Amino acid sequence: MIIDTTKVQQAINSFSRSESLKEVYGLIWLLVPIFTPLLGIIIGVLVIVWLERQISAGVQQRIGPEYAGPLGILQALADGTKLLFKEDLLPSRGDILLFSLGPSIAVISILLSYSVIPFGYHLVLADLSIGVFLWIAISSIAPIGLLMSGYGSNNKYSFLGGLRAAAQSISYEIPLTPCVLSISLLSNSSSTVDIVEAQSKYGFWGWNLWRQPIGFMVFLISSLAECERLPFDLPEAEEELVAGYQTEYSGIKFGLFYVASYLNLLVSSLFVTVLYLGGWNLSIPYIFIFIPELFRINEVCGIFGMTIGIFITLAKAYLFLFISITTRWTLPRMRMDQLLNLGWKFLLPISLGNLLLTTSFQLLSL
């Protein structure tokens, strides 16, 4: 039997011109901007886990992971695969609906925060005029998932851990908000893209780090507390609460809490970069003027400039990650009363005073 290649080619061409194939292409190009950042975020979390293991090994003067891949870089992937195949146990007298929804709410609410983060020039999922406040609103949902997990477990340790997570989030979300308000006042915008571009004019000296040093320190401490990292990991203190709200969990649901923790750490690092460290911009004054010109030359130059922006953003974010990981293995855990006193009696008055000073200077400069 001889195949007529001409007819086959005609059939392929007619299929490629069909409306159904155009709809498939449209759907693919619609999903690409969504799944590309998602893949990047997952890779970023894997790198954070590897970095934490290596840094903790160095601090404790021991050898870190070295068997799963070169230099142990696949260790996090191996741990996730192990948890994926473990049995998913459910508490016999717990609320199964709340128990199952808790980890999902914690992860999804943090993933939504990435939609307003500019990774580079023209590289943001949603450039909203209320970008930073949307992040604050969305990040307030995650403790609800932790509280649901603790309550649905029907375990006293889990419930206490959920209550601690909610109390800690409220205590440090409030001082963090005036710091963001101060940055919005300086930039005359609440858009994350506008905030980055407002820091671009004078290069390194235009960063909000130098104009808001007090706000930067308050934001840094509040971000660590929001991520529940040592010395602020009271909701899952092993010596007091076994594992806190995670006590009754196993399998992939248990792994989701760790994913949420590292996702939150990465998003906090990126917001420190965007708000205080100039985002995707280099430390060269007026360099931002030439970035749009790269896109006008040709697409290759534009993609090259965008890649450099992504690299700069991640380099600054991983600097904050290094500080937070080192802090975890350096400082001891605080008591619950010390944690609340630090948030309500120390950080909140300082952040409000910083906001008052910023508002006064902005009014005087009009």
From Swiss-Prot:
One of its GO terms (molecular function) is oxidoreductase activity, acting on NAD(P)H, quinone or similar compound as acceptor. It is an enzyme of class 7 (translocase). The chain crosses the membrane at residues 28-48, 105-125, 128-148, 250-270, 271-291, 303-323, 346-366. The gene is ndhA. Belongs to the complex I subunit 1 family. Its EC number is 7.1.1.-. The keyword Nucleotide-binding does not apply. NDH is composed of at least 16 different subunits, 5 of which are encoded in the nucleus. NDH shuttles electrons from NAD(P)H:plastoquinone, via FMN and iron-sulfur (Fe-S) centers, to quinones in the photosynthetic chain and possibly in a chloroplast respiratory chain. The immediate electron acceptor for the enzyme in this species is believed to be plastoquinone. Couples the redox reaction to proton translocation, and thus conserves the redox energy in a proton gradient. It is found in: Plastid, Chloroplast thylakoid membrane. It holds the Pfam family NADHdh. It comes from Nandina domestica. Coiled coil: none annotated. InterPro entries: NADH_UbQ_OxRdtase_su1/FPO (IPR001694), NADH_UbQ_OxRdtase_su1_CS (IPR018086). It catalyses: a plastoquinone + NADH + (n+1) H(+)(in) = a plastoquinol + NAD(+) + n H(+)(out); a plastoquinone + NADPH + (n+1) H(+)(in) = a plastoquinol + NADP(+) + n H(+)(out). One of its GO terms (biological process) is aerobic respiration. This is NAD(P)H-quinone oxidoreductase subunit 1, chloroplastic. Keywords: Chloroplast, Membrane, NAD, NADP, Plastid, Plastoquinone, Quinone, Thylakoid, Translocase, Transmembrane, Transmembrane helix. It is a multi-pass membrane protein. One of its GO terms (cellular component) is chloroplast thylakoid membrane.
